[in-house]
C-alpha cells in the first residue's frame, strides 16, 4: 500500500492536459496499479509538500516547507504506507529529508517501527520493478533507509556493495540519522530543552 505524491507544480502547469486534471492526476496512480501496488487516497494527498518554487527556492521559507511535509506525513501515517512514490524530485527530496527534521523537532517518527517511510521517485520505482540494482539507482543516498522496503518487495541486493561505486571504490557513507532509529534512541529532544 502506498500513497502517490502528485499534487505539485508538475500537475498544475498544464491542468487541462493531464489525465485526471490537476486535482486527480492519474498517470502516477496508473503506474502504481499496473505494477501491482495499491494506492492510498489519504486526506492531504492534494496538499503541497512545501517545495514550491516560490516557497522554498525564492523565499527560502523552511518553516512553511517543513510544516507542509509534516501535515502530509501525519495525514498518511494512519494508512501505514510501505513507501511513498513521487513524480516530482522536490516532493521526493522533501518528504524524505524532512522526516529527519520532524523527528528532531517533534520527537515523531513515521513508518514501520518508527524507521521512516521510504520515498521513491517513479523512476526509482520503475527501476526496481524492472530489476535494476538498487545501489545503481542511487537508493543508498536516501535519508530514510530503504533496505526494509527492498526485503518486503523481495528484491535481491548486496549490502556490502551499498557504498561502492561502479569500479568498486568506496563512495562515502552518510552519518546515521534519527529517522533510522527509535525516538528513545535520540541524543536529545528539542522540546525538552
Each predicted region: which residue ranges?
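Iron-sulfur cluster-binding electron-transfer modules in prokaryotic oxidoreductases
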Residues: 1-193
